[in-house]
Each structure stands twice: as C-alpha cells, then as structure tokens.
Amino acid sequence: MASIDLASTPLTATQNVDPNEIKKFEDMASRWWDLEGEFKPLHQINPLRLNYVLEKANGLFGKRVLDVGCGGGILAESMAREGAQVTGLDMGKEPLEVARLHALETGTKLTYIQSTVEAHAEANPHTYDVVTCMEMLEHVPDPLSVIQSCAKLVKPGGHVFFSTLNRNVKSYLFAIVGAEKLLKIVPEGTHDHNKFIRPSELLKMVDHTALQEQGITGLHYNPFTDTYRLGSNVDVNYIVHTRLF
C-alpha cells in the first residue's frame, strides 16, 4: 500500500543535511517500530502530537499532508489512518525502507520520498493542506531554511506545525542528563544541546516567512509515571502551530 521514491539527488555539501545525523538514525532504523526500543518516546508522544494536529487543523480526512523528517513513519502513518493523503519526507534511506515495510504490513496507504525539504518545496509549491515538521529542526544545520521551505509547501489557509526542544539549563538537565545519561530513555548522543532552539528564536524564523503563529504548547514528561502530557510550560519540548494566510 505504501509507495517510496528513493531516486533523490545525491547527498552534497550544499544540502541542508548533517551526514552524521543521517547515519545516526540509519543505524537505529531497524528498531523504529520497537515500542520498547530507542524510539519509545516517539511512540509515547505520538497520540499527543496527532491529537494536537487534528484539533488545530480541524481534522485530516481527505487533506494532503506532508510530514517533513518522517523517519520510520510513526506520525505519518497515524495521520494516514485518519484519512489524510500523506507524503513522508526524509533523507535517510534506511528509515524510509522501514517506514514503507511497516505501512505494507499494516495496510496503510501513503507515499514516502527521499529528498530534502528544500528540493521538495521547489518542485511542489503550495501543495499541502497541512505540513508537520516534528523533532527535526534540531538535527539540521540550517533550521531557517527548513521553516522557509515548509512555508512554500503549504497552501494558503493551510497549517504548519513545528516541534523541537528549548535551549536552557532545564532542557539540558531533562533531555541530555536525564533522558540520555541517567534514565537511558534515548541513546546517548541523540541530541546536541547547542542545536536546541528557543521558542523566541523559532518564532523569529517564522517571522521571516509568510507564516503566522497561531499558538504554542509544551510537552511534558513525568518520569515517575513514564507518561507525557501537553501543557503551557515550554521549558523543554514544545510545538508551534502556524498558518499561511
């Protein structure tokens, strides 16, 4: 049911891609759908992310949706099951293969493409009703370029969602010391705190596009119950909702 286009342009130094980041996630790709593996946090937060998108975008049924930095397809597949026409975009070949195979196993219909968001935006301007870019901005050299490309890809009136990690002492303690070093929730080295993005910085980048911020919410982890919830505090993880008018 899933189709995949791996005929992308070769990886070059001019692309907005960090080869080390690509390799890191390719090495873990086979375990992407292991609910107790390295990507357990993504599986845990996915219902929250999905419900947030559904609420703000007034549902996804029949809409064209692009998931930028889709990896193994956790969010992309869940949006497709809501009736959306989903395209998942990533530069990692192995995660895309895993995503395609999982979609075949579950009978989920969607399309995966190996491409940078910049190249996809050039070829597909104002194509999508909804664009999601979750936990991806902190893994690329130039997050502004990604945000600008997302703005090009969405239709007028459409929605664009960004999620990333705040850069402060608390996020270092929670995301690096706690999650990676102590609790081992994610592999050590998954994140670079210097690449985290403050909400004020992300919103300034949004201001360089035609997108308009519609709201921001935090994503909170409770280590005692091993659960996540949405809330007003954006000290660590957060999601920004924007629209193109």
Curated annotation (Swiss-Prot):
Keywords from the UniProt entry: Methyltransferase, S-adenosyl-L-methionine, Transferase, Ubiquinone biosynthesis
Q: In which pathway does it act?
A: Cofactor biosynthesis; ubiquinone biosynthesis
User: Which is one GO molecular function term here?
Assistant: 2-polyprenyl-6-hydroxyphenol methylase activity
Q: Note the Gene3D superfamilies from the entry.
A: Vaccinia Virus protein VP39
One Pfam family named in its UniProt record = Methyltransf_23
EC number(s) on record? 2.1.1.222, 2.1.1.64
* SUPFAM superfamilies on file: S-adenosyl-L-methionine-dependent methyltransferases
At the top level of its lineage, which domain of life is listed? Answer: Bacteria
Which catalysed reactions does the entry list for this protein? a 3-demethylubiquinol + S-adenosyl-L-methionine = a ubiquinol + S-adenosyl-L-homocysteine + H(+); a 3-(all-trans-polyprenyl)benzene-1,2-diol + S-adenosyl-L-methionine = a 2-methoxy-6-(all-trans-polyprenyl)phenol + S-adenosyl-L-homocysteine + H(+)
Transmembrane segments annotated in the record for this chain: none
Keyword Methyltransferase in record: yes
Give GO BP annotations, semicolon-separated: methylation
Which of this chain's residues are annotated to bind S-adenosyl-L-methionine? R49, G69, D90, M134
Q: Which PANTHER family match?
A: METHYLTRANSFERASE, UBIQUINONE BIOSYNTHESIS O-METHYLTRANSFERASE, MITOCHONDRIAL
Q: What does this protein do?
A: O-methyltransferase that catalyzes the 2 O-methylation steps in the ubiquinone biosynthetic pathway.
Q: Which family does it belong to?
A: Belongs to the methyltransferase superfamily. UbiG/COQ3 family.
Which named protein is this? Ubiquinone biosynthesis O-methyltransferase
Q: Which organism is it from?
A: Vibrio cholerae serotype O1 (strain ATCC 39315 / El Tor Inaba N16961)
- What gene is it encoded by? ubiG
